[in-house]
Amino acid sequence: ENHNNYLQRLHGLFNYGIKRGYLAENPTKVIDKVKVAETEPAIFAAEEIKALLNAVPRRAVPYFAIGSFAGLRPREIERLDWTDIHLEEGYIRVRPKVAKTASNRLVDIQPNLRAWLLPLSCESGPVTPPNIRKIREAAQHKIGLTQWPQDGLRHSYASYHLAHFKNINELATQM
């Protein structure tokens, strides 16, 4: 967490104290927020995604394919069950207990994702194998990736989806 996040939380806490009569004013008013330079999120090149998918064991392919071609967050993929993946109907159901936002959403399965998932699909059970971080690190080393950007697969999906479909509103509903 950064300075601004802490400041925001403290501001709310002190406002609560003011409403209860414990304080006359909020002391966080005099603290300046830190100006954070906006940076573009790092993404993977298409060749890197292909190399990654070919470098991981078969059992881990669905995790990386869903991150790359459906844009789910790592924790969302880790919580997915195969019963959430509807290949025939063409969507992944991200249930509230799976989603970061605790809301239900349906994410389209694009043809490239379907092609990766179809030969590996199961009727039920966890999508993500145990020790996914170790699997990722081994594959990353194998293909020579020195950095693993936070949410890199998700950001890659967003960038490529927007470039292909040119519809920010559609992308927002998928994310």
Describe the function of each predicted region.
Residues 54, 61, 70, 107, ...:
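Short, basic (Lys/Arg/His-rich) helix/loop patches that form interaction surfaces
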Residues 4-6, 19, 23-74, 78, ...:
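Basic, Lys/Arg- and aromatic-enriched nucleic-acid-binding interface segment
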Residues 79-85, 172-175:
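A short, basic/aromatic helix-end/turn motif that makes direct DNA contacts
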Residues 35, 43, 94-102, 114, ...:
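Catalytic-site neighborhood detector that most strongly recognizes the C-terminal catalytic loop/helix
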